[in-house]
Structures are given as structure tokens and as C-alpha cells.
């Protein structure tokens, strides 16, 4: 019986070659998913470079720019360019995921 348990333990170690470093299967899956997502995002960035100008702008700048211009028109600040620049910088994180 003990030999069967040892074999089972050895089988588990063999299934996870990085267990000696303390990596669990779930951590390995997370790492693999991150690698896949990184590859997809790099492919997407390449795709952005190959887009026509209008499509590139529509996917990258237009969404945040329209929202910023809407707020600008509503608030009508005395320094609209600085206001818009500040708005874009403050809110860029919301839109970076989409690029």
C-alpha cells in the first residue's frame, strides 16, 4: 500500500515538473494564460500598424477623444486645450485595455 502511495506521489511530481520550485498546477496555468495573452496583444499591436489611418484612429484615439470632447463641451472651461489634455491623461487607463 505504501509503495502505491509513493508511486502516486511520484506520478504527481512527474505531472508538474516545476513543483520543486513550489509552482502549483494553477500557477502554471496562469503563467501559460499570460503568455498566450501577451502573444495576442503583440499580434494585435502589429494589426494596428497595418490598419488604414481612419480605422487606426477609430480603434485607438476616437473613443476617449469623443468622451473628452463631450465633457469639454458640457463644462466649457476657460482653457479648453489644457482641460482636454488633462482629461485624456487622467482617463487613458480606461481605454488602454481596448487598444
Curated annotation (Swiss-Prot):
Disulfide bonds: none
Residue(s) carrying Phosphoserine: 19
GO CC annotation, single: MLL1 complex
InterPro entries the UniProt entry points to: Dpy-30_motif, DPY30_SDC1_DD, Sdc1/DPY30
PANTHER family with a match to the protein in the record: DPY30 DOMAIN CONTAINING 2, DPY30-RELATED
Function of the molecule: As part of the MLL1/MLL complex, involved in the methylation of histone H3 at 'Lys-4', particularly trimethylation. Histone H3 'Lys-4' methylation represents a specific tag for epigenetic transcriptional activation. May play some role in histone H3 acetylation. In embryonic stem (ES) cells, plays a crucial role in the differentiation potential, particularly along the neural lineage, regulating gene induction and histone H3 'Lys-4' methylation at key developmental loci, including that mediated by retinoic acid. Does not affect ES cell self-renewal.
Family assignment from sequence similarity: Belongs to the dpy-30 family.
Protein name per the record: Protein dpy-30 homolog
